[in-house]
Structure formats: C-alpha cells, structure tokens
C-alpha cells in the first residue's frame, strides 16, 4: 500500500515480473554485485517498498547477507546502529539523508567506527529526500580520511508503483541532487506541467494498477501508458542528457507570487540549505 501521505492509501498491485525486472535492472547498473555477494546492514522494514523490493531482494538475488539493524536514525536508537556498524562492515549502505546526518558525528570522532564502516564499502546510497551538499561533502571527507579515497555516492528515484527504481546514479557525479538516468528497461518522459517538467514512467517495473480501484488506475496513466508519478525533474545539463536528471520537487508544490513569478520550492529549499551550511540543516518554504 502507498503511504497515503497526500490521500487515502492505495493497494499497489506488485507482480513477480516487476520484482524480477527491478533486480535485473539494478544488477546491470552495479555489475559488481555478481562478482561478490553483498553484505548489508539495514533498518528498513520489509513492509516498505525500498526495504523489501530493493534491499531484501538485492541480497536474495545475489546470494548476499542481510543483517537486521535494530537501530534507526532517531534519538535513542541511532546508538544501536553505531554499535552494529562496529561489528558489521557493509559493502553497500542505504539510508535517508537524516540517517547520514545523525551517523556522521560518530564517524567523524570515532576512528575505529569509521574504519569498520568504510573498510569494504563499495557504495553509499541515499534516497527518500534530497541530500544537502554539506552532508555529501562530510561523507566524502570522512571516506578520504579513513581509506585515502572517495566511496561511490549514488542515489535513485522511484515509487511504490514502480517497484522501486526508475532512475539510477551508477556513474560518477560531483554533487548531490542528481537522481540519475533511466534504469535499464525503463522509459522516462518529461512532460510540461505549469512551470515544471513532470516525470512520467513506463516499463516492466511499473504496476498494472491499483487493487480493486479501476477508477484510480485509469487516472494514474496517460494515453501512451506512462505512469503519472507526480514528481518533477529537469536535466542537469540540457546539452548533455547523459549527465542525468535533477529532482525538482512535486509538480503541485510550487506557488505563484502576486507579481506572477513562480516560486520553485524544492530549488529554493536546497539553495538555502547549501548557502547557510552548516548552520542551517533544513528549511521550509511557505507562501
């Protein structure tokens, strides 16, 4: 079921084809998964699309090891995550930006923990929200200080209705905010919507519809069969689409001033956080 954060929760039909297509897409993005079984420490529940469809199935698909983290990035539980990371050196580490924000102070002051964390790490994966540039810079600095080189920093973009992954950053990038290029087997279309470009998705990872809600299913797809996800994006470099797409917030979150000027909330928020870092960790744009 979707989270229902902007409406009633909807049952998303998830097929075996979707799950298999998603994992095949991931392993084509990260071929090293077939060379060495992944080792993952994860706190996400399996009732969560990312926790199950992505993380659990990566381990299942590639014969890896999944260690269940009984901590999580909240006060009183982050300490359990830190203790677990002393015992388990992951090869892939997934978290939301808030999780890295809470973990970084421990990595920066505890050399033994940093050694355990970075020892065998192939990639750091952030998702769920935009990663502020100051957190990106601190993670890179911690990796270089600990192992003498950067660790690959990656992300992706998707939804419950798309199994998980629609776009993937599986190439080197120098800054936060890029959500990558369409994953293998996935088509992404940018469609004008008011002042933004709406992202629409088609491919074998997309749900056939909502459980017992043909009315909502019909509304969710356009005439060409693309799923209308409701997010907006723009090309990082209009002259070079291969550099990827930048997440541009929700289509409906922007507003217009009395002057007629559009306010792009997502861009303003990230700009404020970046300009005021490290004093400001988050910002809310209203109007």
Tell what function each PLM region has.
Residues 197-257:
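Conserved ATP-binding/catalytic segment of the ANL
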Residues 4-5, 63, 128, 158, ...:
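Conserved G/P- and acidic residue-centered "switch" motifs that form tight phosphate/ATP-binding loops
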Residues 173-182, 221-225:
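Short Gly/Pro-enriched turn/cap motifs at secondary-structure boundaries
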């Amino acid at each position: 079921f979707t989270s229902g954060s902007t409406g009633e929760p909807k049952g998303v039909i998830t097929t075996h084809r979707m799950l298999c297509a998603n994992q095949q897409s991931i392993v084509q993005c990260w071929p090293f998964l077939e060379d060495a079984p992944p080792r993952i420490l994860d706190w996400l529940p399996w009732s969560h699309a990312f926790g199950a469809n992505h993380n659990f199935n990566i381990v299942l698909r590639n014969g890896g090891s999944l260690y269940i983290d009984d901590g999580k990035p909240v006060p009183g539980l982050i300490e359990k995550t830190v203790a677990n990371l002393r015992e388990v050196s992951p090869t892939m580490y997934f978290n939301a930006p808030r999780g890295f924000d809470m973990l970084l102070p421990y990595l920066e002051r505890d050399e033994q923990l940093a050694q355990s964390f970075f020892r065998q790490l192939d990639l750091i994966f952030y998702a769920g929200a935009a990663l502020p540039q100051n957190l990106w810079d601190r993670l890179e600095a911690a990796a270089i200080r600990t192992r003498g080189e950067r660790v690959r920093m990656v992300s992706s973009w998707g939804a419950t209705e798309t199994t998980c992954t629609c776009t993937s950053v599986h190439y080197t990038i120098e800054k936060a905010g890029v959500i990558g290029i369409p994953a293998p087997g996935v088509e992404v279309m940018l469609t004008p919507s008011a002042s933004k470009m709406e992202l629409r998705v088609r491919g074998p990872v997309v749900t056939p519809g909502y459980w017992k809600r043909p009315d909502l299913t019909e509304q969710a797809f356009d005439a060409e069969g693309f799923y209308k996800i409701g997010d907006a994006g723009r090309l990082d470099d209009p002259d070079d689409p291969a550099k990827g797409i930048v997440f541009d917030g929700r289509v409906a979150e922007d507003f217009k001033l009395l002057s007629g000027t559009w306010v792009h909330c997502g861009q303003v928020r990230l700009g404020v956080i970046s300009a005021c870092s490290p004093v400001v960790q988050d910002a809310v744009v209203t109007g």
